[in-house]
């Protein structure tokens, strides 16, 4: 039998190669993105109190949305929640900032972060020349040893200031 059309023009082997490459691309595009489990220990509370959102299922949905939201889009989710449930209690506002921090940490492949009132400890960190220069512009002292970066500050940190530091320095 004589082949015609596209297969005849390119040959069966090349056609099979096109099909396999196309399948590889399709499979790659549907693979779930697995985010690493980030250990974040901070000194502020962050939650959605039952007094703010009564239904457990709605609170869980908000937590899930925040878990999968890029830090640049967290404020959009926050605005939706405020529109629906009213002004956020401080502990819930902290939750949205904490979600931004988690997203930045995930983006930078930092698996552990401990935040104290005047200190941020990160691990692991690859201290590139660019990151090193940005860190030196901050008003603080830092220690870098064994892929662990410890930033010490004079002033007490706020959730917003921690997010700003991590987003701009790493």
Where are these regions (language model features)?
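Accessory helical-bundle/CTD segments and flexible terminal tails appended to RecA-like ATPase motors
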Residues: 1-170
């Amino acid at each position: 039998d004589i082949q015609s059309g596209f297969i005849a023009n390119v040959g069966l082997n090349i056609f099979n190669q096109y099909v396999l490459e196309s399948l590889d691309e399709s499979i790659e595009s549907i693979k779930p993105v697995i985010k690493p489990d980030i250990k974040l220990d901070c000194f502020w509370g962050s939650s959605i109190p039952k007094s703010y959102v009564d239904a457990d299922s709605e609170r869980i949905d908000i937590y899930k949305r925040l878990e999968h939201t890029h830090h640049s889009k967290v404020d959009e989710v926050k605005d939706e929640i405020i529109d629906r449930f009213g002004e956020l209690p401080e502990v819930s506002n902290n939750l949205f900032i904490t979600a931004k921090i988690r997203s930045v940490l995930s983006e930078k492949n930092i698996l552990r972060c401990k935040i104290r009132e005047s200190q941020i400890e990160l691990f692991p960190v690859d201290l590139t020349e660019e990151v090193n220069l940005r860190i030196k512009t901050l008003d603080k002292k830092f220690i870098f040893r064994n892929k662990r970066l410890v930033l010490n500050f004079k002033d007490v940190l706020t959730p917003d200031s921690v997010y700003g530091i991590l987003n701009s320095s790493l």
